[in-house]
Every structure is written in C-alpha cells, then in structure tokens.
Amino acid sequence: MSKAKELQEAGLRLFQEGLYDEAAQRFSEALEHYAEEGKEIEAAEMLNNLGIIRRKQERWEEAAEAVEEAKRIFARLGDKSREAQAWGNLGGIYASMGKRDKAMEAWQAAIGLFAEIGDEDKQGETMMSLGIALFKDGRRQEGLAAYQAGLQMVKHPTTMQQVTRVLMTIQAKLFSLGF
C-alpha cells in the first residue's frame, strides 16, 4: 500500500472517530503524496474530504474553497460522478452558510450530472435536498414535488423515507378524493 493510501485510510478512520483536525492533517499529507505521484483524481478526493471536514467544523469558507477546487479538477478530468458529488457537497455547504440560492444552484448542477450518468440513487437524494431548500424558501409546492420525485428515485430508502413514501401516497389519494 502506498504512503498516500495509508494516510488517506488513517484520515478516514480519524474522521469516523470525530477527530477532525487529525483527519484533516492526514488528508493534507495524502494530498501532497498523491500530487507528487501525479494522481490528480485522488488528490482532488483529498480536497473534497478536507471540505467535508471543514463543513463539520463550521469553517464554511475553507470548506467551499476546498470543494470548489476539487470540483474544478473533477470537471477538467471528465469525472462526472465525482464532479456531481462535489456539486452536491457544495450545495450542503452553501445551505449551512444560509446561501440558499447558491445551494439550490449547486444541487441542480449535481442533479443534472447524476441524471447524465444514470445514478438515480444520488440524483434522488440530491433532489430531496433541493426539495427541502425550496420548501424552506417558501416555494412549498415546488419543494414538495422535488422531494417526492427524489424520494421515488431512491432505490434503498431508509425506514423514515419508506414511511414518508407511504404518507405521501395516502395524502395524494385523499387529495384526489376531495379531502
């Protein structure tokens, strides 16, 4: 196993333990090693990981900068899946910053890319995030429609998502009956 990969795995373990500063250090070191080895995709993954850590730490600007850079690299290299994931991460960061319009734009970009590559699960999850943002923005009907459409796309819904599906189906039936 390469030194970069070892550092990456150590970073993931530390992240899962909630040791964010230590995880960020390992990811930064892995980033340097991957860059030296000319492994741009892996280096960009480390940037994306750093962005996720900075979001957890509420260091919004650093989070956005890291994920933006990762997104640019993924786009340049033609990795649409990772680019879409980075767009989705940016949506979450912008939403946390209270920049709802930028969050919605980022999620829409992610949804488009996920649709392009046929990843319905991630497309659905992202549509649900967009739906929540639209709902909070006062665009209730549009938000509910996006959330419901996203919920239907998720192949392996959580228990809560399954319950929500049932409730939305009941609501639609009652509405169609005039209740």
Question: Where would I find each of the regions flagged by the language model?
Answer:
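Conserved alpha-helical positions within TPR/SEL1-like repeat arrays
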Residues: 5-18, 25, 32, 41-56, ...
